[in-house]
């Protein structure tokens, strides 16, 4: 049976429930925990990663911005874990769904804007009008800056969706080509499998980079409004 190219991005269900819930909640249960060794290798690596994330994200923030430390750390770990799990065979990647990415981007963006309007409304509103703007251009620039402000969460979600989806589609195409050529040309199949392996390594890096970019942009929005 021939499948559509976008079949892997259809949300699967198990007993009528979205399988994305299992993908998100089940993997943490597989991580071994030690009741006797507090500072084992896994804990040390986790602490090192958290310190690295906080150093990269929160250095330029003030006291109000640093209250978001736990949120941003959890966000980057969640997106990175979801992207990496989606690279496993016969798995589903929730971040290929624009609806899910919008559900993450819009509340975070709205929270940063609300924070700016609450604590420094004048400075936040002055961002809508660049300093030194000629008087005839003021109405048009206010409209342009307002539209660009409301496009920010859409850009966040579309960027993550497009990058993850494009990589999965390319892997699907190359994998299908390798399978089709298996009985036709073995040397060419080996070359294709080598390309697929390299692409998988690249997609692993992209999965981590996109999680970092998404969280970094949220951090920048927070910095502008805190």
UniProtKB/Swiss-Prot annotation:
Pfam families: ATP-synt_A. It is a multi-pass membrane protein. It comes from the Eukaryota. GO terms for cellular component: mitochondrial inner membrane; proton-transporting ATP synthase complex. One of its GO terms (biological process) is proton motive force-driven ATP synthesis. InterPro entries: ATP_synth_F0_asu (IPR000568), ATP_synth_F0_asu_AS (IPR023011), ATP_synth_F0_asu_bact/mt (IPR045083), F0_ATP_A_sf (IPR035908). Keywords: ATP synthesis, CF(0), Hydrogen ion transport, Ion transport, Membrane, Mitochondrion, Mitochondrion inner membrane, Transmembrane, Transmembrane helix, Transport. It catalyses: H(+)(in) = H(+)(out). The keyword Lipid biosynthesis does not apply. Its main location: mitochondrion. The keyword Protein biosynthesis does not apply. The chain crosses the membrane at residues 12-32, 68-88, 97-117, 138-158, 182-202, 203-223. It is found in: Mitochondrion inner membrane. One of its GO terms (molecular function) is proton channel activity. NCBIfam families: ATP_synt_6_or_A. Component of the ATP synthase complex composed at least of ATP5F1A/subunit alpha, ATP5F1B/subunit beta, ATP5MC1/subunit c (homooctomer), MT-ATP6/subunit a, MT-ATP8/subunit 8, ATP5ME/subunit e, ATP5MF/subunit f, ATP5MG/subunit g, ATP5MK/subunit k, ATP5MJ/subunit j, ATP5F1C/subunit gamma, ATP5F1D/subunit delta, ATP5F1E/subunit epsilon, ATP5PF/subunit F6, ATP5PB/subunit b, ATP5PD/subunit d, ATP5PO/subunit OSCP. Belongs to the ATPase A chain family. Subunit a, of the mitochondrial membrane ATP synthase complex (F(1)F(0) ATP synthase or Complex V) that produces ATP from ADP in the presence of a proton gradient across the membrane which is generated by electron transport complexes of the respiratory chain. ATP synthase complex consist of a soluble F(1) head domain - the catalytic core - and a membrane F(1) domain - the membrane proton channel. These two domains are linked by a central stalk rotating inside the F(1) region and a stationary peripheral stalk. This is ATP synthase F(0) complex subunit a. It comes from Pongo abelii.
């Amino acid at each position: 049976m021939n499948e559509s190219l976008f079949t892997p991005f259809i949300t699967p269900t198990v007993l009528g429930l979205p399988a994305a819930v299992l993908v998100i909640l089940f993997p943490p249960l597989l991580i071994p925990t030690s009741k006797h060794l507090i500072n084992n290798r896994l804990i040390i690596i986790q602490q090192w990663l958290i310190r690295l994330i906080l150093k990269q994200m929160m250095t330029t923030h003030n006291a109000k911005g640093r209250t978001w430390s736990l949120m941003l750390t959890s966000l980057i770990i969640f997106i990175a874990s979801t992207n990496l799990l989606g690279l496993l065979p016969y798995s589903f990647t929730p971040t290929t769904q624009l609806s899910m990415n919008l559900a993450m981007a819009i509340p975070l963006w709205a929270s940063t804007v609300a924070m700016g309007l609450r604590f420094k409304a004048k400075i936040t509103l002055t961002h809508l009008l660049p300093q030194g703007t000629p008087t005839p251009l003021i109405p048009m620039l206010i409209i342009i800056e307002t539209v660009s402000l409301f496009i920010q969460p859409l850009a966040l979600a579309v960027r993550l969706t497009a990058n993850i989806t494009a990589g999965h589609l390319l892997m699907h195409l190359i994998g299908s080509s390798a399978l089709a050529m298996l009985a036709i040309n073995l040397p060419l199949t080996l070359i294709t499998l080598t390309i697929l392996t390299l692409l998988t390594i690249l997609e692993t890096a992209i999965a981590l980079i996109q999680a970092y970019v998404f969280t970094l942009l949220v951090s920048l929005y927070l910095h502008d409004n805190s």
